[in-house]
Amino acid sequence: MKKLIAILAAGILALPAAVSAEDSSKPIVIPTHNWSSQVVMAYVIGGIFESMGNNVEYVPADSQAVYEAIRSGDVTISHEVWQSSFGKSFYNAMAKGGVIDAGTHAAMTLEEMGVPTWVIEKDLCPGLPNWEALKNCKDVFATADSGGKGRWLEGPQSWHGDLMPVRVDALGLGDDYVVKFAGGADALWADLAAAKKEGRGTIIFNWSPNFTDAEGFTFIEFPEYTDGCRKADGGDGSCGSPKGWLKKAANYKFPKTHPAAYT
């Protein structure tokens, strides 16, 4: 988490030392979502704004619907727009007007299914990280609630919809694997910790940059992403995730109502 926070903090809206007299007294509304690093950064950013003399409010928000909330002015900014998960919602809101691209962080991102690296080091599923190794490893990843199949633990369904269930079927793994959805990032990290303690294999959704970069995590290598490969875009959905950008979004009025905070 420290790595991600450092990257995001370095790329946050460039802030001058003191609040401008032009900055509105209207609160800057910052959303909080269902993954811990986003919540931590929301309060870090809010603290910076408050130190400049700005008023700040925090509101829980759905990670897809937040861009409509920004467009309508109910939310002011979003500091973590991950391309693979939220790019479409972000651009759809921009196309309607009211949302602006407030810049791109330097880090490239990847959002994908993977395994803790020790699963590979212990050779629990020979052939990983190549996805085809999964054909012979369902028992390694079976859990009490997976009905004898191997389990993929996805993030909340609001993040990607049916992207992973479609991929499992498209790869011909549907008879051997089932996708379960976690309630939030904390549930993913809890499963990761439990798997390590129990010495069992686990396939979970993860992203980079993240604190697990240092802990040791390996993304599974699925068929390469190409334009149009996902089912929603006319493909069969078997492809993996693309490397992508990490952006910031803001209400179109923000540069005018809070020029010092935005500059």
Task: Please place each PLM-identified region on the residue numbering.
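Short, polar/charged alpha-helical segment
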Residues: 36-55, 166-169
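Pocket-flanking alpha-helical
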Residues: 42, 61-97, 187, 191-195, ...
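Ligand-binding pocket segment of bilobal, Venus flytrap-like solute-binding proteins
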Residues: 75-80, 153-233
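Gram-negative bacterial Sec-dependent N-terminal signal peptides
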Residues: 1-20
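A conserved helix-loop-strand patch within extracytoplasmic ligand-binding domains
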Residues: 98-153
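Short, well-ordered beta-strand elements
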Residues: 23-37, 54-59, 149-153
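Short coil/turn segments
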Residues: 33-35, 118-120, 155-160
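C-terminal lobe and pocket-closing loops
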Residues: 213-263
